[in-house]
């Protein structure tokens, strides 16, 4: 709870001090998300929408079995609604909202299958990837129709023309960010807190005031969710929340020409995803070479490696919050110094 409180106070001070015009939407999102979570919790308990824990996961997580999931339903609609009202239903808001909701539906379907089957197997990996790619292709089509510049901008350095290579990169960012947030959602408060910070960073460095408003509204709604998701969590966001948040992050970065900010400020999320890729790749490589698969980490993603090394959940979450906050601060300083 202390970590969530510190994070909330820090982000509130940041908003009021640097972007006071979004303070009201930010605050409304925090309060609305916390309230809707309180209303949704008993409903999810009645529906017996409890999380199924992986057998191969850390033993300490098995006691979390049965904790209500699908918590994304309690905070994503709040942030999107507040941002929609605040922006006057601007087309930029609509694009982010539809992308977020599309990925939220994929996550909800996965959560629903897990609950229905009482196993940790929801959508197959292939089915989920196909849906993620399909939604990503539609969004890329929208970006092309809007005629956005196919460049990679770095503050203080300039714009790197990518031409047609921009589109594979955009699709990779959409699908990759989705999965990075999903993988980071493995400890109480971890994904929600880190994403709240990265969203705030995107809001601070956004040139478009509408995108800044959307980013801060969604950052606030993540903070409100932490009321129920901090250690020991009473509500999990599930894939419903993590895939939706991943879509929002990627959509904001692509629309706002902020891929640099997403990569830099979200580097801990990137590390979480890379840890899984490296773990799987190294295991398969050593198994093919020696007949015996070996692991680089005790367990992936990275947060489980640290946990099995003796770190408590609170220590891991606090460390990842601190690293993300540092990256956001340095990213904002870089952007500010460059005069962007």
UniProtKB/Swiss-Prot annotation:
Its EC number is 2.7.8.13. The keyword Cell cycle applies. Its cofactor is Mg(2+). It is an enzyme of class 2 (transferase). One of its GO terms (molecular function) is metal ion binding. The keyword Transmembrane applies. Catalyzes the initial step of the lipid cycle reactions in the biosynthesis of the cell wall peptidoglycan: transfers peptidoglycan precursor phospho-MurNAc-pentapeptide from UDP-MurNAc-pentapeptide onto the lipid carrier undecaprenyl phosphate, yielding undecaprenyl-pyrophosphoryl-MurNAc-pentapeptide, known as lipid I. This is Phospho-N-acetylmuramoyl-pentapeptide-transferase. It comes from Synechococcus sp. (strain JA-3-3Ab) (Cyanobacteria bacterium Yellowstone A-Prime).
């Amino acid at each position: 709870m202390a970590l969530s409180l510190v994070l909330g106070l820090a982000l509130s001070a940041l908003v009021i001090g640097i972007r006071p015009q979004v303070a009201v939407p930010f605050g409304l999102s925090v309060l609305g998300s916390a309230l809707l979570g309180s209303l949704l919790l008993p409903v999810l308990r009645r529906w017996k929408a409890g999380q199924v824990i992986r057998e191969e996961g850390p033993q300490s997580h098995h006691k979390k079995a049965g904790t209500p999931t699908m918590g994304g339903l309690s905070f994503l609609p709040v942030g999107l609604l507040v941002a929609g009202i605040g922006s006057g239903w601007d087309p930029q808001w609509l694009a982010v909202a539809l992308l977020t909701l599309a990925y939220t539906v994929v996550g909800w379907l996965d959560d629903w299958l897990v609950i229905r089957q009482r196993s940790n197997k929801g959508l197959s990996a292939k089915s989920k990837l196909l849906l993620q790619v399909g939604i990503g292709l539609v969004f890329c089509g929208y970006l092309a129709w809007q005629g956005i510049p196919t460049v990679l901008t770095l503050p203080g350095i300039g714009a790197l023309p990518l031409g047609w290579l921009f589109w594979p990169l955009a699709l990779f960012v959409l699908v990759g960010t989705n999965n990075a947030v999903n993988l980071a959602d493995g400890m109480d408060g971890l994904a929600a807190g880190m994403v709240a910070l990265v969203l705030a960073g995107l809001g601070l460095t956004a040139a478009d005031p509408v995108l800044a408003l959307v980013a801060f509204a969604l950052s606030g709604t993540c903070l409100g969710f932490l009321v129920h998701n901090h250690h020991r969590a009473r509500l999990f966001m599930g894939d419903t929340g993590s895939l939706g948040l991943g879509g929002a992050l990627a959509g904001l970065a692509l629309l706002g020409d902020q891929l640099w900010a997403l990569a830099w400020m979200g580097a801990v999320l990137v590390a979480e995803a890379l840890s899984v890729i490296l773990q799987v790749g190294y295991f398969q490589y050593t198994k093919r070479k020696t007949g015996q698969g070996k692991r680089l980490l005790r367990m992936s993603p990275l947060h489980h490696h640290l946990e099995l090394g003796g770190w408590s959940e609170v220590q891991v979450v606090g460390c990842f919050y601190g690293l993300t906050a540092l990256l956001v601060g340095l990213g904002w300083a870089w952007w500010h110094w460059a005069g962007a």
